[in-house]
Amino acid sequence: MSNSLRGMLAGLIATLVLSGVLILKANMGLWSELNLIRLLVSLGSIQTVAAWMDHFIVGVVVWGLLFAAFDSLWESRAYWLKGLIFGVFAWLMMMVLFMPLAKAGWFGTRIGPAAAYVTLGMHLIYGLVLGVVYGLLTAYYPAKAPENPSTPRG
């Protein structure tokens, strides 16, 4: 299994877990002012379904592929730790790129003081799941060594 596929599969599982946390948070009425899907909808004239699709594209494709690419830069097999660090990276990108675009201010300051902490917690969950699942996929489905075309076949 390729690193890219492992990254996207791990990203899918992590995004599903994060989506469950978002739905649970909304159903419990916690931090209702911090609704990431509503923030995505506010960026343009897109519907809620399209915002969820964007959420999955970023979580599965963008972050999944970036995690797979960054995996080779750090030779540790502590995938859970790589995931947590990557979660902080993804959170920082959200705080300095997405939040200002959504008119929520740097680090979500216009939403309220809890915005930065709550989203950090959610990104740490995402990163932890991403790293653990990627590590499990790496253990169970190691990358195939490329064939050497100069080696004669028997």
Question: Where is each model-derived feature located?
Answer:
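Juxtamembrane/disordered regions of integral membrane proteins
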Residues: 1-154
